[in-house]
């Protein structure tokens, strides 16, 4: 640590002068006053980066910033703190002591990943209105792709930014590519050193407002201002490099072959074999949740992963690919950025573009995407966070970008059947069944597999209450969530003593009975909208509710049918009386389609949801006979 912690250098003085007050940003917990990155590219490709952060903390919620953690990979990086201090509101400066720092492995329990480290420290004397100021250096040695380099920088975020500056110093004889996103007016200032040996690029943004966060908004890469630089010319350089890393690790031994033979014994078709192997890797090999690249980039050998029964995304993909190949099924690695549907091929070629590794197999002449990190995904399904992403599939060293298919509305959602037997006092016996598909199936399977028996019962009891207040379970069925087919089905029988309200002459029963819940509230409550509405998880929810009338009552009034639509959403409800007038069948269908809705149509979408909520309050009125 620097010994001049109490010296107010020019950068700190500037930060103190332009630091805003809490009243200027009442909806923010802090401001990023100074955000500086300065990197030097050495002739051998070594990257020496110096980073300085100065934050103004407005309130107690901002104190989380006092706990600083700097992740790095010890196999090719080193990190040291140059200076760290807190400037209190009265101007007093409290410096961090060297003994207050801690260097720890982020995954101590997993020896395969002990190179994934974190340098952490706690800023002293933090209180409302203080500044925290720390500077650290990160050195990245050129061991991954010798001679190549890449960097990534974000200028804004959900907090106000007073000054964000990113500077690159590079030998003048080295080529560099840069690309700025979401700010056409940002251009670097480029200069040469006095001796002409170093070229300097300075990118700077000032006085950036916080990014407005809204439900169903575009991904952050689509709205934030960010920059990437790279020395690489084509994506094929990365494809060839990763293939050379991963192919030697996808070699089976006798133990792995034996495991595959046991898994596929008695199975004759390729889909059966692929499903059995996928289920084993997804369910039996523990997933260590490291982003691609945090623990180096070379996967561990498939045999080692099988022996240890744990691995990160690239390890599980390598094991899956190796086992499929042993079974005679071709499979390859696919790199992607999970949770981001940006078109990666339009970006510069960098390893920072990927945070996940999965597999794609060729089964019975069809392409099948397989993400073995998600035990909640059945064979043939793929996590919602992967869908719509552009993945680079690497076949025999050649990379090709392919879109992971998004769900269509009929592939995801909920299909429910409800049978209601009313009695004369307003109570009812209710039989329900629900089948979840796609994303809904994944969510329920993930929930179910993590519950104890008592928790499973509690979940079903809560669901019974959502159908009718005061309802009690009679019997129920909830699968354990293990990897199986793509659907997830639940059955439930319950007694609902207060389903309907009764008066001297009438019985009132809600028209909305059942298990559809996506329309139970309006997700769009703000008066105005900044960003487009992105529907990335299309689905269809369909329910059929049959109400058997009690003796001594007849239908007095039925609610009107409902038909609503706007942009990418549709809602329909019909109520049909049986010929003998002893049954009602209520059918509800709700459809959302994938796409983008411009902000100009926001009011229509908001009104659409409000209209559904209003319709949910409709009543069926029955009158006593005789």
Residue ranges of model-derived segments:
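A sensor for short, sequence-defined functional sites
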Residues: 2-626
